[in-house]
Amino acid sequence: MSSIPRLLLGALLLFPLALLAQGKKRTDQPLEMARLPAVPTLPDAFPQVVGTQVFGPAYKFTKDEAVFEAAKGISAMGSRILKINAVSGQQLTPYVAMPFTHYVLWYRSSNEWTKGFTPELRRREYNAVYLFTKDLLTRYDTAGKTFFLGHWEGDWYLLPDKDVKKDASPELTAAMIEWLNVRQKAVEDARSEVPYAKCRVYTYAEVNRVRDAMKDGRKRVVNAVLPKVNVDFVSYSAYDSQLLPVEEVRATLDYVNAQLPAKPGLPAKRVFVGECGLSWKACGADGAKHEQRNREILAKLLTWKPAMVLFWQYYNNEVVDGEQVGFWLVDNKNNKTPLHATLTELFAAQEEAAKEMRARTRRLPGYEEIAAFSENWLNARAPR
């Protein structure tokens, strides 16, 4: 694997003792961010980049709660990344005990604010996010881990009837801007009050109708909300571009990233892929085709070198007319798909590559190096 200089995001995800830009003021950037404390490094931890998630699974096979059962399965694959819905710090405790290094969390991902973001709702939102963040920052069991707090596909909040020929209304757009900024302030206030924190907590907003804005000029989260908020990162639910040529995929990610105001202490590239993938049904219930097409999608998205690319998902959540749609790595009969095997082998290959790099260079790979390695590895795989 070639030696690529680690960029700032790689440093963030690997938890260095200090951010490269920490303590330095950038006069060209008007936005300010609370200084982040130094945190310890987890032994042998590196940004794995590729991962999966579990939301609303339609089945399970043990006495465990369905999401927890799936999280165990994801960990058994060798994954270091987990994306789930979070309700409270207490609910997260068994997940934090697992050997994941990065947690992408839907937290308070509801549409209550779309009905009018009243002072009382603002107060409740701020308090909940502040207390949740402070809990993560002060717990002993979160040491060395990174948490991203965000929400489900933001454009559906702005288009409640899912009519993509419409623009988002000014009222909903303004409410979303305020909602995201309240959440950001809560996280930054909590971060500033815990100088001894042993983990990282960031915010993200999720966009999902990017091409509407990019190609048709429609008002969407990406162009109407992102330029006016102060979120740390952006998640892109990439279904509207994942089947396009690789040049268009990269251009779309560039477009999303360009809408973000720069932030001191954070890298220039702050977009990750929060959802992608084709269902079993969309691939004709053919395991080999499902593996190949999704492997190609993952490799294509990795060419942009995002910090994460997350496949949707481990257990299927969609059932139509009694039939499983098949957004899965493990089906409703507890059969592991060929794609499950591919990702499990990828995670093992990443571990070996990281060990080799550490032995050779005395450092672990950064996110861009792992993204490049994973892209090449996936492209080199023979069809199953």
Task: Report each predicted region and the residues it spans.
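Aromatic-lined carbohydrate-recognition surfaces of secreted/lumenal glycan-active proteins
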Residues: 150-151, 177-218, 266-277, 308-314
